Amino acid sequence: MTEIVADKTVEVVKNAIETADGALDLYNKYLDQVIPWQTFDETIKELSRFKQEYSQAASVLVGNIKTLLMDSQDKYFEATQTVYEWCGVATQLLAAYILLFDEYNEKKASAQKDILIKVLDDGITKLNEAQKSLLVSSQSFNNASGKLLALDSQLTNDFSEKSSYFQSQVDKIRKEAYAGAAAGVVAGPFGLIISYSIAAGVVEGKLIPELKNKLKSVQSFFTTLSNTVKQANKDIDAAKLKLTTEIAAIGEIKTETETTRFYVDYDDLMLSLLKEAANKMINTCNEYQKRHGKKTLFEVPEV
């Protein structure tokens, strides 16, 4: 009977640690890397580079899009930081949990139970906070997607050859070309006419086609960005769904852990299984913290 109770305790405790570890591992390997933020950083720089290539109306939309993308990134990394905080607490608690197996007694068993429930409880709290941040991040992406649709319509109007914006760009090119021709006029009575003729050929044959190609590349850039933002929004929604499942699983195992008797006679194999599960989660936490550029304070204890 005692052995059956011990087996049940080991199963519950091991499952509790592995469930928490699984949620963290999911965040570490999937949720936290689902958006290519380096690409988005480069994109935000490109938004500024193109600022001379669209009308004032389009410029306002671009400013809105840039703000929304930056807001989304802030909230996404806020979620990441929340999970980082859970790791900081969990590594300390699990290291203490492992050390309590030394000269095991009922008091230490009770402390282990408190520790494990604390790890699970903090996990639920922090992952729920991360979930809320991801929701806001997703909303910003969704709003940016709407602005990009409006921008595409605006750019289509701006870049139409009959639009006032397009004509203003052509007039600017012609003015600069003819001013240059006048400044470098060839000597003689027909010099200005010749220079203007050359300028006209350059404007109509080269500069205006170049303008069309440049404007086309600008619109293509924003079309690509629109597709990327839509995909990012879908990815975050999928991430939130996965995280919801993990939070529910932790909640279920926490309830079972609270009603489980911890002070039982463990054999060597049982102890090994529990220590291995705790060490694995500590390693997952360390991996997460190191990947986020901060020094890990707690390593797996020698036991």
UniProtKB/Swiss-Prot annotation:
Record key words, sorted: Cytolysis, Disulfide bond, Hemolysis, Host cell membrane, Host membrane, Membrane, Periplasm, Secreted, Toxin, Transmembrane, Transmembrane helix, Virulence
An annotated GO cellular component: membrane
Compartments where found: Secreted; Periplasm; Host cell membrane
Family matches, as CDD domains: HlyE-like (cd22651)
Transmembrane regions listed in the UniProt entry: 183-203
PTM remark: In periplasm, it forms a disulfide bond, which prevents the oligomerization. In outer membrane vesicles, the redox status prevents formation of the disulfide bond, leading to oligomerization and pore formation.
InterPro entries in UniProt: Hemolysin_E
GO biological process: hemolysis in another organism
Disulfide bonds: 87-285
Annotated GO MF terms: toxin activity
Membrane topology: Single-pass membrane protein
Function: Toxin, which has some hemolytic activity towards mammalian cells. Acts by forming a pore-like structure upon contact with mammalian cells.
Family membership noted in the UniProt record: Belongs to the hemolysin E family.
NCBIfam families: PRK11376.1
Record text on subunit structure and interactions: Monomer and oligomer. In periplasm, it is present as a monomer, while in outer membrane vesicles, it oligomerizes to form a pore structure that is active. The pore is formed by a dodecamer.
Protein name per UniProt: Hemolysin E
Encoding gene, per UniProt annotation: hlyE
